[in-house]
A protein has these predicted regions:
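Short hydrophobic/aromatic helix or loop-helix immediately within or flanking a transmembrane segment
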Residues: 73-78, 89-121
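Membrane-interface transmembrane helices that cradle and orient dolichyl/undecaprenyl
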Residues: 185-200
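Transmembrane-helix signature of polytopic, membrane-embedded enzymes
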Residues: 142-164
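Alpha-helical transmembrane segments and terminal signal-anchor/GPI-anchor hydrophobic tails
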Residues: 69-88, 218-351, 396-424
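Membrane-interface alpha helices of multi-pass inner-membrane proteins
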Residues: 200-224, 341
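Membrane-water interface signatures at transmembrane helix termini and the short loops
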Residues: 159, 167-185, 212, 310-372
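Extracytoplasmic loop-helix module adjacent to an early transmembrane segment
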Residues: 44-92
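Transmembrane-helix motifs of polytopic, lipid-linked glycan transferases
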Residues: 129-148
Length: 424
């Protein structure tokens, strides 16, 4: 039975009453409806609930701890104090493509602000609107897993979905540019390599990601490099082996290097990332928890477990079915993993693009290994457990960025909480 047939059967089983129950449940308790939807995550009605909960969750974003997660505060202030007309946006687009000195680094954020403030001055509307493109591409990517005939209602499949989404989860919409770019890049990359012949459509999708976040000017040549190396699988696996030590290299070692020996444009970029202020903000997380060494050990464990993934996957490279359906993506994954390992010492940049690797890791584990071998799924969950705990339970991003009544109040109450607000 083909994947499409399986999907059709699943959708046909959904009747009017199932839709009515889930939507009514959502009105009464959005988070409860979200949890219930996970029971049948592949269904159309469940995807509708995922989408609606994502929008209402982002509408409800509001800083609860002003000393942490200043991305949300900064974006809110930008939304509140920025005012763009249609003419302003058009001029920014022209300046951007003319490479003018005063052109914005990217266009996406200002466009979102313009659209949002065309309807209301409420900054919460900005996050609700920003959630829409994020959710479209995240859920389209997720559907590439749930539409597979192997996907079932087991705990292993739910763990795979979690590992797939967690690197760039819904809370990251607090700064929507990079996280939206990630899911566009992930979706377009997977679909590009799924095609029998390489697709211009999906390449263009990757090519427009720098308009969303300027950091994707790094990903675009990286992607093209992967295409150039597609006929050299042995080279890519050797690059991965060579890159492994770099994945453990710390800022403390590399910050002592003399970057002035590099070409001017590279030295300026490196010194910017390596200066003490940048390190304190993004690496030490000053003002946060003092369990520094616990976090470092947990990071080493997580890095090690993820490094096992390509080694497990590589064993299946000569399997005829794997080679036919996933061979091109597997080789690209090995290549991009190696390339990003080489820049792990760079604060922010290395971590940002490692999120794409982690998402692809979960996808390929499901497509290539599951269900014949399930232990790697558990290892990954254990390797990520400390960071899941810190993010969702120990004063992390969720409790600092979203009032916790989003998890127990009904939908009308959550909407009214920030109705008519013009500040934070």
């Amino acid at each position: 039975m083909s994947n499409n047939t399986v999907t059709l059967v699943r959708r046909q089983k959904e009747d009017y009453w199932q839709w009515l129950f889930k939507l009514s449940f959502f009105v009464l308790w959005p988070f409860g409806a979200f949890l219930y939807a996970l029971k049948d995550a592949a269904s159309r009605s469940s995807y509708t609930i995922f989408f609606l909960f994502g929008v209402i969750f982002c509408w409800h974003m509001n800083p609860t701890n002003l000393d942490r997660y200043d991305d949300l505060i900064g974006i809110m202030e930008t939304v509140i104090y920025s005012d763009y007309s249609f003419s302003d946006i058009c001029n920014q687009v022209i300046d951007y493509f003319n490479f003018s000195e005063d052109a914005p680094k990217e266009l996406y954020n200002n466009l979102l602000i313009f659209i949002s403030k065309s309807f209301s001055l409420n900054p919460h509307l900005f996050f609700a609107i920003a959630a829409v493109p994020y959710l479209i591409f995240m859920l389209k990517s997720l559907k590439l897993i749930t539409d597979d005939s192997k996907f079932d209602k087991s705990i292993y499949c739910l763990i795979i979905l979690a590992l797939f989404v967690l690197p760039r989860d819904i809370i990251t919409v607090q700064n929507p540019r990079f996280t939206t770019g990630v899911w566009i890049a992930v979706y377009a990359t997977i679909r590009f390599f799924q095609q029998r012949h390489y697709s211009l459509k999906y390449f263009v999708m990757i090519a427009i990601t720098p308009l969303i976040h300027s950091g994707f000017w790094f990903y675009l040549p990286l992607f093209i490099g992967g295409l150039l190396l597609r006929h050299y699988p042995k080279l890519t696996i050797w690059l991965l082996y060579i890159s492994v030590p770099f994945s453990y290299m710390s800022y403390e070692i590399l910050s002592t290097f003399d970057y002035s020996l590099l070409p001017p444009f590279l030295s300026k970029w490196a010194e910017n990332y390596m200066n003490e202020e940048h390190f304190s903000k993004y690496v030490l997380h000053e003002g946060g928890s003092g369990f520094y060494w616990v976090a470092r050990i947990a990071a080493i464990i997580k890095t090690t477990v993820y490094l096992l993934v390509p080694l497990f996957l590589w064993k299946y490279k000569d399997n005829p079915q794997v080679k036919k359906e996933h061979g091109s993506l597997l080789q690209y994954y090995i290549y991009i993993y190696a390339a990003i390992n080489f820049i792990q010492f760079v604060p922010v940049l290395g971590e940002r693009f490692m999120w794409i690797v982690q998402i692809l890791s979960a996808y390929l584990i499901f497509k290539i290994i599951y269900p014949r071998d399930k232990k790697l799924i558990i290892w990954l969950l254990i390797g990520c457990s400390y960071f899941i705990f810190r993010r969702y339970f120990y004063g992390g991003a969720v409790s600092s960025s979203v009032p916790l009544n989003v998890f127990y109040n009904p939908a009308p109450s959550l909407i009214l909480d920030f109705w008519g607000v013009t500040g934070y």
